[in-house]
Design a protein with these regions (language model features):
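Sec-dependent N-terminal signal peptides
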Residues: 4-15
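Exported/periplasmic ABC-transporter solute-binding proteins
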Residues: 20-44, 50-53, 57, 61-65, ...
Length: 246
């Protein structure tokens, strides 16, 4: 009888531990930094984070369709605001970081006059994320439109479903250049040599990245802890190290 009770207790304990895992929908641009944030958060609270990455638009659609996420870290503010307006979140989103758009390549081709470079025969393929579902893709479209070359470069564009796919196109040489997030540079340290330039933030809408807790969560207390952590000075220090404005 004692043995049965012990086994039952262990099962309950294991279930409790498993129940601590927070499922966090994470914008693809955060795939590198979320590992560092999750490690730091676990050290502070003992709570395990299970990140599920994708484009912000696709993640928002999954949430509307009932995906079992607890928290959503978006690459913009509009997708979490939309979820709030439709009643999927516990409250309006907070901004946890500001993103920076870069043009980047594995080739040292010079970005002094990057718009002229994109029009030249030196560049055959340009990677951007789908502007409809990926905020950094939308920012790239805005910047290219502002420079007056969006229409002209259409035959060269290779579109990724998320910034992660764009980064793969860049690192594997599928694209000569691409538009990505500054956090890619930190992610690539010690792995891939990259040449890059920050795009003037005046030529695209500021990339405000928002966080929300989802009403569907069954772990409200832990979700609140993670929410507060992401807005804390410790998390901001990590995000800043990855090139985000805080």
């Amino acid at each position: 009888m004692k043995r049965v009770f012990l086994v039952f207790s262990l099962l309950l304990f294991s279930a409790a531990l498993f129940g601590q895992n927070l499922r966090v929908a994470v914008a693809a641009n955060l795939q590198g930094v979320i590992k560092v944030l999750a490690k730091d958060f676990k050290e502070k609270t003992g709570i395990e984070i299970e990140p599920i990455a994708g484009s912000s638009g696709n993640l928002a659609t999954q949430i509307k369709n009932g995906a079992p996420f607890d928290v959503f870290l978006s690459a913009d503010i509009s997708f979490p605001e939309g979820l709030f307006n439709e009643g999927f979140t516990t409250k309006a989103p907070d901004v946890y970081a500001y993103g920076s758009l870069i043009i980047v390549s594995t080739q040292d081709i010079g970005f002094e006059n990057w718009e002229r470079l994109l029009l030249s025969p030196r560049v055959n393929k340009i990677a951007i994320a789908n502007p409809k579902i990926a905020p950094y893709g939308k920012a790239a479209e805005e910047a290219l439109t502002k420079k007056g070359i969006w229409t002209d470069i259409q035959p060269k564009i290779v579109q990724g479903e998320s910034i992660a796919q764009v980064n793969t196109y860049i690192s594997t040489g599928v694209a000569d250049v691409g538009f990505s997030t500054q956090s890619l540079i930190k992610d690539a340290e010690g792995k891939t040599k990259l040449y890059w330039k920050i795009i003037d933030p005046q030529i695209y809408t500021p990339i405000k990245q928002g966080i929300v807790i989802l009403k569907a969560t069954k772990q409200t207390a832990n979700a609140e802890k993670f929410y507060r952590y992401i807005l804390s000075a410790d998390a901001k220090k990590i995000l800043k190290a990855y090139g985000y404005g805080v």
